[in-house]
């Protein structure tokens, strides 16, 4: 493939896709990623996964503070790219940048556009009980995920799949979809199909508060919520701790109880069942497996219950 490609991306998802392109000998002439960020508990700067891969391959790298900076835009022009590929870069790009490459900018979106436009298509699709996801490649315009569709593929969402697991599956197949698109661009056969605006939905970035579990819902819905916010921002609930009032309890893994009848009041702790802690939902029940009490280490849910002298009777 002779196309000169500039790649813009930041997290592990983007690094996985980039590796697929590099393994296929795509001519990456430059890479753009976000500036290094300090660790939460120290001042040490952490490089993005895309930066680490770029450095390991000795590919020219830019980390602009602002993508509108004239010096940065001048450097992009010097790379004389035929096409820009954008994967989870993390910034909405202005038209001046989009106009630089000969054939335009193409974005790999981890969702089936026009549904789930925004930063969290993977998480919100699972939280909504979705059973099918996929990648969409669009030719970018100045809007948020509004460009014409060039290619689509599909990935089934397994009944126990978390957002982290779906992200891995989409990244693995997304690189192949981009390779197909680049081949079509080079051959002059790529198609651009306008999105159906009537079908558009939004998927804004999740907040930590959205990880909160609402037990007054069917167990299937609660389970979808937990899977959708795993690993980030993470699911949580509350319990009453003797002498300490309401405390948060992180829920890191759970599974559905096979019997779907009514067990008790929503959030009621029904006790230990095997290795799990059984919690009633509005319909059915959920088995908590691994939890993390506020200020404590990760532990088995049954050990948390036993360690509280079995005084925890309800989650809320």
From Swiss-Prot:
Q: Which UniProt keywords apply?
A: Protein biosynthesis, Transferase
Q: Which GO terms describe its molecular function?
A: methionyl-tRNA formyltransferase activity
E.C. numbers: 2.1.2.9
Q: Which Pfam families match?
A: Formyl_trans_C, Formyl_trans_N
Q: Name one GO cellular component term.
A: cytosol
* Disulfide bonding pattern of the chain: none
Q: Where does (6S)-5,6,7,8-tetrahydrofolate bind?
A: 111-114
Q: According to its UniProt record, which reaction does this protein catalyse?
A: L-methionyl-tRNA(fMet) + (6R)-10-formyltetrahydrofolate = N-formyl-L-methionyl-tRNA(fMet) + (6S)-5,6,7,8-tetrahydrofolate + H(+)
UniProt enzyme class: transferase
UniProt keyword Transferase present: yes
Q: Sorted alphabetically, which SUPFAM superfamilies does this protein's record hold?
A: FMT C-terminal domain-like, Formyltransferase
Say yes or no: keyword Transferase present. Answer: yes
NCBIfam families this protein is in?
Answer: fmt
What this protein is reported to do is described as:
Attaches a formyl group to the free amino group of methionyl-tRNA(fMet). The formyl group appears to play a dual role in the initiator identity of N-formylmethionyl-tRNA by promoting its recognition by IF2 and preventing the misappropriation of this tRNA by the elongation apparatus.
HAMAP family noted in UniProt: Formyl_trans
UniProt lists the family membership as follows: Belongs to the Fmt family.
Recorded protein name is Methionyl-tRNA formyltransferase
């Amino acid at each position: 493939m002779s196309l000169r490609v500039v790649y813009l991306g930041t997290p592990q998802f983007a690094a996985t896709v980039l590796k697929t392109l590099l393994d296929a000998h795509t001519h990456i002439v430059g890479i753009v990623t976000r500036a290094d960020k300090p660790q939460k508990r120290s001042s040490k700067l952490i490089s993005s996964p895309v930066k680490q891969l770029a450095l390991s391959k000795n590919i020219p790298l830019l980390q602009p503070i602002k993508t509108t900076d004239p010096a940065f835009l001048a450097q992009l022009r010097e790379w004389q790219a035929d096409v820009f590929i954008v994967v989870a870069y993390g910034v909405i790009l202005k038209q001046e940048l989009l106009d630089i490459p000969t054939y335009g900018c193409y974005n790999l979106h981890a969702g089936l556009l026009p549904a789930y436009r925004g930063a969290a298509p993977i998480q919100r699709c699972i939280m909504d009980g979705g059973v099918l996801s996929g990648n969409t490649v669009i030719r970018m315009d100045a809007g948020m995920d509004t460009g014409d569709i060039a290619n689509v593929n599909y990935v089934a969402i397994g009944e126990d799949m978390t957002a982290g697991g779906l992200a891995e599956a989409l990244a693995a197949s997304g690189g192949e979809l981009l390779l197909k698109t680049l081949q079509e661009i080079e051959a002059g056969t790529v198609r651009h199909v306008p999105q159906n605006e009537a079908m558009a939905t939004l998927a804004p970035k999740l907040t930590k508060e959205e990880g909160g579990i609402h037990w007054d819902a069917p167990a299937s819905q609660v389970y979808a919520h937990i899977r959708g916010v795993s690993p980030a921002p993470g699911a949580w609930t509350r319990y009453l701790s003797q002498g300490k009032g309401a405390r948060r309890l992180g829920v890191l893994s759970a599974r559905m109880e096979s019997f779907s009848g009514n067990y008790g009041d929503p959030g009621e702790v029904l006790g230990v069942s095997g290795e799990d802690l059984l919690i009633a939902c509005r319909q059915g029940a959920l088995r908590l497996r691994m939890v993390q009490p506020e200020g404590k280490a990760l532990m088995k849910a049954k050990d948390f219950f036993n360690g509280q002298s079995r005084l925890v009777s309800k989650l809320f």
